[in-house]
Amino acid sequence: MDWERILCCAHRRCGWRRKAIFITNKHVLEGNDTIVLRLNRKENKGVSEIDAHLKSGVDNLYFVHPDNDVDIAVLPLRGDFITKEELDYSAFDIDNNAMDSASLRDAGVDEGALVHMLGFPMGLVNSSSTLPICRLGCVARLSDAQIAETKNILVDIQNFPGNSGSPIVTRPEIISISGTKSLSRSMLLGIVHSYIPYHETLRNTQTNEIVEVRSENSGIAMVHPVELIREVVDLFVKRYQG
């Protein structure tokens, strides 16, 4: 299993101390006992590959959302190991560098707002690369009804295998139409977990029978919003505070 699907994130909630965690999609971790994390070392000293265990006996060491339709998982990391190995742990603070969907709308982020996707799509990045590919897209739908029904924000962006768990961040805007709001800093909007497929049906002209169904990437990515990420992180916090 490849680290490149995993979003690195920091956490500080409810007055609790900062804790290092990985946030990714549930489907990335399911069915595996371990994953390999590739993390940069400080001062450009190369890359470390680290085995991370996902199970203790039959129990998972990671946390998932109680709603089966939410494809989010949180894996705690050992902060002392990160310090000892001198790893460059650049991360999103889930409280201070992220905004839930309601806060985004209040800040002026809506349909058409530009966003970036950061990730390592398989086959598109050289294996020795330490920097992600950045792709530009825009918010396609950010409505309350959309999120309540599907648990997703829709983003017009091309995501590929290997982008599961990729962060979507807002693009800072310093110019806005008079009387409207604009968000002047990059904030985590959510994480990608899949895309809406486009199906094309081929029929035999003589029998009118379906002979083939092709599935293509429609270019609309499904993104779980920050509020759902925080709900999973809070499960982890309650476990270790209790």
Predicted regions and their residues:
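A conserved glycine-rich beta-strand in the N-terminal activation segment of trypsin-fold
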Residues: 1-21
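Residue-level recognition of beta-strand microenvironments
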Residues: 8-10, 142, 171, 194
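Alpha-helix termini
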Residues: 11-17, 173-182
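C-terminal recognition in membrane/secretory proteostasis and scaffolding
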Residues: 239-242
